[in-house]
């Protein structure tokens, strides 16, 4: 299957990174290389792009798309490892870092990956298929309380208690093996009126399980910190999020780096000695235009936040 993915907030990201033609840039979520191909077009032969992705299919597609460029290094890894990756490449500092935290259209549309609640497939949801831990283990082995907590916390699902209870009851008969089995269980757990209103009834639960499988939120804070430490002064970090949980983490971390002072508010001056390491380029998240949402409905919930290293 062709690796299709429409780059979200493309022009906004390119502007955000303030690309220098001889700079070094890291795309932490290379995917189909939509953003990266445009970054490379702005680089001279002295510039360099480092593309990281934990999905081998994505790396293969990116190499094909970027084959005309020689100034690219490909890394099969999780962006959580950005510090070691740059150390191994003997690159102390970079000019820009991009993270697109969305699931690619390819991953959603290829049924076999198990990300979609619209297509039947084995319960998987692994971004990195070299890992053993998948959605199957979560659905069939987590306790009811553990299921409840991830569905509530990562999916912000108001019927988390009912859904986790239904999952545990159903799997007592036989293991839950496919996405459609799970969808049916979720639908049965949610009241009919709620099913008829709002998004697909399985959307939030699938999001929660995917986040847990890939440790998406657990690694984000540390990755931002490590990335900022690797930026040159004036270097920029741009992060695209697609749901409120991610955006909240990014927003709060950016604010903390911009204002790390821990002194009580009533103190007339700072005595803790903690200095800002970044400035906020965008105070508010940048959202797609109406035109972009019409062309690519999956961009609707996207939000871009940008910081610059001091």
UniProtKB/Swiss-Prot annotation:
<feature type="binding site">
    <location>
        <position position="100"/>
    </location>
    <ligand>
        <name>S-adenosyl-L-methionine</name>
    </ligand>
</feature>
<keyword id="KW-0489">Methyltransferase</keyword>
<keyword id="KW-0963">Cytoplasm</keyword>
<keyword id="KW-0949">S-adenosyl-L-methionine</keyword>
<dbReference type="InterPro" id="IPR029063">
    <property type="entry name" value="SAM-dependent_MTases_sf"/>
</dbReference>
<dbReference type="GO" id="GO:0005737">
    <property type="term" value="C:cytoplasm"/>
</dbReference>
<feature type="binding site">
    <location>
        <position position="53"/>
    </location>
    <ligand>
        <name>S-adenosyl-L-methionine</name>
    </ligand>
</feature>
<comment type="similarity">
    <text>Belongs to the methyltransferase superfamily. RsmH family.</text>
</comment>
<keyword id="KW-0808">Transferase</keyword>
<feature type="binding site">
    <location>
        <position position="79"/>
    </location>
    <ligand>
        <name>S-adenosyl-L-methionine</name>
    </ligand>
</feature>
<feature type="binding site">
    <location>
        <position position="107"/>
    </location>
    <ligand>
        <name>S-adenosyl-L-methionine</name>
    </ligand>
</feature>
<protein>
    <recommendedName>
        <fullName>Ribosomal RNA small subunit methyltransferase H</fullName>
        <ecNumber>2.1.1.199</ecNumber>
    </recommendedName>
</protein>
<feature type="binding site">
    <location>
        <begin position="33"/>
        <end position="35"/>
    </location>
    <ligand>
        <name>S-adenosyl-L-methionine</name>
    </ligand>
</feature>
<dbReference type="InterPro" id="IPR002903">
    <property type="entry name" value="RsmH"/>
</dbReference>
<comment type="function">
    <text>Specifically methylates the N4 position of cytidine in position 1402 (C1402) of 16S rRNA.</text>
</comment>
<dbReference type="GO" id="GO:0070475">
    <property type="term" value="P:rRNA base methylation"/>
</dbReference>
<dbReference type="GO" id="GO:0071424">
    <property type="term" value="F:rRNA (cytosine-N4-)-methyltransferase activity"/>
</dbReference>
<keyword id="KW-0698">rRNA processing</keyword>
<dbReference type="Pfam" id="PF01795">
    <property type="entry name" value="Methyltransf_5"/>
</dbReference>
<dbReference type="InterPro" id="IPR023397">
    <property type="entry name" value="SAM-dep_MeTrfase_MraW_recog"/>
</dbReference>
């Amino acid at each position: 299957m062709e690796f299709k993915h429409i780059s979200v907030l493309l022009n906004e990201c390119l502007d955000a990174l303030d690309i220098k033609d001889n700079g070094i840039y890291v795309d932490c979520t290379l995917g189909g290389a939509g953003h990266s191909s445009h970054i490379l077009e702005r680089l001279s032969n002295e510039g360099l792009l480092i593309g990281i992705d934990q999905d081998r299919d994505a790396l293969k597609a990116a190499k094909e798309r970027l084959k005309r460029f020689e100034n690219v290094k490909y890394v099969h890894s999780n962006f959580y490892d950005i510090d070691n990756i740059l150390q191994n490449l003997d690159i102390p500092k970079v000019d820009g870092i991009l993270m697109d935290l969305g699931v690619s259209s390819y991953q959603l549309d290829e049924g076999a990956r198990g990300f979609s609640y619209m297509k039947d497939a084995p319960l998987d949801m692994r971004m990195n298929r070299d890992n053993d831990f998948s959605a199957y283990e979560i659905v069939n082995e987590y306790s009811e309380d553990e299921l409840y907590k991830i569905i509530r916390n990562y999916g912000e699902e108001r019927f988390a208690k009912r859904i986790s209870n239904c999952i545990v009851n159903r799997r007592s008969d036989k293991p839950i093996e496919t996405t459609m089995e799970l969808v049916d269980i979720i639908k049965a757990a949610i009241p009919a009126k709620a099913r008829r209103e709002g998004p697909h009834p399985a959307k939030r639960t699938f999001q929660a399980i995917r986040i847990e499988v890939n440790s998406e939120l657990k690694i984000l804070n540390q990755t931002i910190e490590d990335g900022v430490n690797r930026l040159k002064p004036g270097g920029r970090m741009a992060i695209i999020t697609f749901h409120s949980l991610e955006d909240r983490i990014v927003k709060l971390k950016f604010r903390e780096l911009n204002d790390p002072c821990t002194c009580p508010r009533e103190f007339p001056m700072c005595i803790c000695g903690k200095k800002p390491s970044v400035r906020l380029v965008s105070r508010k998240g940048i959202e797609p235009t109406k035109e972009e949402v019409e062309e690519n409905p999956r961009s609707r919930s996207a939000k871009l936040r940008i910081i610059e290293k001091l």
